[in-house]
UniProtKB/Swiss-Prot annotation:
Biased composition annotated in UniProt, kind: Basic residues: 38-51
Gene Ontology cellular component annotations, sorted alphabetically: apical plasma membrane; caveola; Golgi membrane
Compartment annotation: Golgi apparatus membrane; Cell membrane; Membrane, Caveola; Apical cell membrane
Keywords (A to Z) from UniProt: Cell membrane, Golgi apparatus, Membrane
Residues in the bilayer without spanning it: 262-290
Entry superkingdom: Eukaryota
Compositional bias (Acidic residues): 22-31
GO MF term (any one): molecular adaptor activity
Gene for this chain: cav-2
Organismal lineage: Eukaryota, Metazoa, Ecdysozoa, Nematoda, Chromadorea
Protein name stated in the entry: Caveolin-2
Function: May act as a scaffolding protein within caveolar membranes. Interacts directly with G-protein alpha subunits and can regulate their activity. Thought to have a role in the uptake of lipids and proteins in the intestinal cells; operates in the apical uptake of lipid markers and trafficking of yolk proteins. Affects fecundity and egg laying.
Residue numbers on the Cytoplasmic membrane side: 1-261, 291-351
Result of knocking out the encoding gene: Defective in the apical uptake of lipid and protein trafficking. Reduced brood size thought to be due to attenuated nutrient supply.
Bias (Low complexity) ranges: 167-184
């Protein structure tokens, strides 16, 4: 947006004030305008209007309304010089966080200062909507010596687009053609692999046994019988000699404990071997014989249940109706008494 105020009494226009990019470069302009306004106030007090150069704005919020400007000029008040939005400044390029959306970088050197400080970096950044989807252009404007500007465009492509390899990085073509291999090793087919179950044995071999608790599921707690659960002497009348009672307790417990250990030492491994075969045989019969036969029988009975009512209605019932009709006229004759003549026998002529 551009605005320009002219004097009503003067026909000639003043020369335009030079334009600047940053706010720091407008200090000299402000001092010159103050001196010129003070000199013009003594000669043209009734028609005093402060001259403003051509100002540039970035946003609408920075622009004052025209009524406020005329009100201040009518009251001989100084209209403040519009200031441009300051851009973030950094000491070096490494301090910039969001380098993805940077469109312009300007490096300013401290020419007027005798202090040896690092140049300041001013970042000009566009909005996200103004940046392309596939690439970001970064313009570096460096002025280490003077105010000369060098534009060095650099395009950073998105990582999803593969970049072509440099000719030097490409592998050189082979000088000699390699001979084709006659033997090819095909990976083994897991469906046809002869697996004897080594993976299933591994958890058993590395299993750590709990030597203190050998009945983790409490399935044989009824075997925990002691001497006092088997032998009891209820009253003094049935008390045996003290040494007999004491030695009986010790002998019973010791013999029971060591007899079990000796029996397990002799027959434990054999019974474990036979038990493994027996349970494996039962599992084999259940998986490969009993269960298939059970499934087959259930399938057959399901078909019989559908056919049986029709068999009873259309075959069995008519058959027994016919048998009942045949034997319903049966008569029993005895040698004693009057002979019973059937109905159809009355019409038969005997020769």
């Amino acid at each position: 947006m551009t605005r320009q105020n002219t004097s009503e009494s003067d026909n000639t226009q003043r020369p335009p004030i030079p334009q600047y990019d940053t706010v720091d470069d407008i200090d000299e302009l402000t001092d010159a305008m103050d001196k010129e306004d003070h000199h013009h106030h003594h000669h043209h007090h009734e028609h005093h209007h402060q001259h403003q150069g051509i100002a540039q704005y970035d946003t609408v919020e920075e622009v004052e309304t025209l009524e406020t400007v005329h009100h201040r000029t009518s009251l001989n008040q100084e209209v403040p010089t519009p200031q441009r939005r300051s851009h973030p400044q950094y000491d070096n390029l490494d301090d910039i966080d969001d380098q993805e959306y940077i469109t312009e970088v300007e490096v300013k050197s401290n020419r007027g200062s005798t202090l040896t400080t690092r140049p300041h970096v001013t970042i000009k950044q566009d909005e996200i909507e103004d940046i392309g989807e596939r690439q970001v252009t970064v313009i570096e404007i460096a002025s280490q010596k003077g105010s000369t500007k060098r534009v060095a465009p650099r395009k950073d492509y998105a990582p999803s687009i593969p970049l072509p390899e440099h000719p030097a990085q490409q592998s050189a073509p082979p000088t000699q053609q390699s001979r084709p291999q006659t033997t090819s090793h095909k990976p083994p087919n897991p469906e046809m692999e002869f697996d004897i179950g080594v993976k299933n044995i591994a958890p058993v071999l590395i299993h750590k046994m709990n030597m203190d608790d050998r009945d983790p599921k409490d399935s044989a707690q009824y075997l925990n019988t002691s001497f006092f659960e088997v032998f009891n002497e209820p009253s003094e009348q049935y008390h045996s000699i003290a040494c007999v009672w004491t030695l009986s307790f010790k002998i019973f417990e010791i013999v029971r404990i060591y007899s079990y250990k000796i029996l397990t030492l002799i027959f434990g491994l054999i019974i474990a071997f036979l038990g493994g075969i027996l349970f494996a045989l039962f599992a084999f019969l259940n998986i490969w014989i009993f269960r298939p036969i059970l499934i087959l029988t259930r399938m057959a009975f399901a078909q019989i249940v559908l056919i049986w009512p029709m068999f009873l209605i259309y075959i069995v019932r008519p058959f027994f109706y016919s048998v009942g009709a045949i034997f319903s006229t049966a008569r029993l004759h005895t040698s004693r008494g009057e002979q019973v003549v059937e109905v159809w026998e009355k019409h038969i002529h005997h020769v």
